[in-house]
Amino acid sequence: ILASRLGYAYLDTGAMYRAVTYEALKKGLIDPAEITAMTKALDMEVKPGRDAMHVIVDGEDVTPFIRTPEVSGHVSEVSAIGGVRTAMVAIQRRQAEKGGIVLDGRDIGTTVLPKADVKIFLTASVHTRALRRFKELEAQHPELSLEDIEADVAKRDYMDSHREISPLKQAEDAILLDNGDLTLEGTAEAMIAICEKKFPGFSK
């Protein structure tokens, strides 16, 4: 929504790690060295858009397959692999160099773009994020319970914040925004207000 309102492209970096995880699971890979080698050999193309983005791997749009519970259960492990992060960050920076883009991810302000014009650390409680995810998934995955998703969200938070490379943390110059009580539209409005405060008139 934010990118669309600003007329910017949108890049969900988490989708890139999910795509790598999907490919690793499809190939039955577990060893970090093998996953790194696979990642380096992938022909990955990201197509940012104003409302959504697509991840193309070896000519196939894998976007519809990367939000499954199986991928969610392994993405933190795969994204913690140094070689995988190095490859993905390089792609993300190339996209950012084009300008006019909103990057969404857990290490953007600290690792990918430490000199970004505006940094917002978006957060909400584990329960709130799990409930949102549950509502997204319940139609396609009725076997999942809210408790399962909440446990998975908490596990991912722990793993991402304790990994050695690019851990999840708020950049010192990032603005903290808790959107636990905000709608999607309200969150976008709050982020635009933050941007306007730093660069008056930029969104007009």
Residue map of PLM features:
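Active-site signature of alpha/beta-hydrolase-fold catalytic machinery across serine-
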Residues: 1
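N-terminal phosphate/diphosphate-binding loop that engages ATP/GTP or pyrophosphate donors
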Residues: 4-69
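Residue-level signal for inorganic ion chemistry
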Residues: 14, 59, 88, 102, ...
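ATP-dependent NMP and nucleoside kinases share a basic, alpha-helical "lid"
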Residues: 63-140
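Generic C-terminal helix-cap and adjacent flexible tail
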Residues: 193-204
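Hydrophobic "anchor" residues on beta-strands that sit immediately upstream
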Residues: 8, 54, 100, 174-175
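Hydrophobic/aromatic beta-strand patches that form the interior of the parallel beta-sheet core
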Residues: 11, 118-120, 175-177
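Small-molecule kinase domains that catalyze NTP-dependent phosphoryl transfer to phosphate-bearing small molecules
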Residues: 47-49, 85, 92-98, 110-111, ...
